[in-house]
A protein has these predicted regions:
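Active-site-adjacent loop/helix surface patches within enzyme catalytic domains
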Residues: 2-17, 22-90
Length: 90
């Protein structure tokens, strides 16, 4: 599997202490081009990010390192977990 590391988001922080990755969250974006979708996910003022963006052809863009907490799940709750961003890849 080849990852494209050309773009990096500044929208991340550290995972909360004790949180391990338990979930993979898949999102869909209606933004038409890869470039515009990536720009949306890395632009600081948008305050949103994802670990990866996978385009229609299967290219994988790595935007946030896996050991960091991307901002993709917002204020969320699942099975007693109140910080999905800290316990997921999204």
């Amino acid at each position: 599997m080849k990852f494209i590391n050309k773009y990096k988001s500044v929208n991340f922080n550290l995972r909360k202490k004790g949180h391990k990755i338990k979930y993979i969250i898949l999102h869909y974006t209606a933004i038409k081009s890869d470039y515009k979708a990536i720009q949306h996910l890395i632009y600081k003022k948008n305050k949103v990010s994802s670990h990866f963006l996978i385009n229609k052809k299967g290219k994988i863009f790595s935007l946030v390192d896996l050991n960091k907490r991307a901002w993709h799940a917002g204020q969320s709750f699942w099975k007693g977990d109140r910080d999905i961003n800290s316990s997921s890849i999204g």
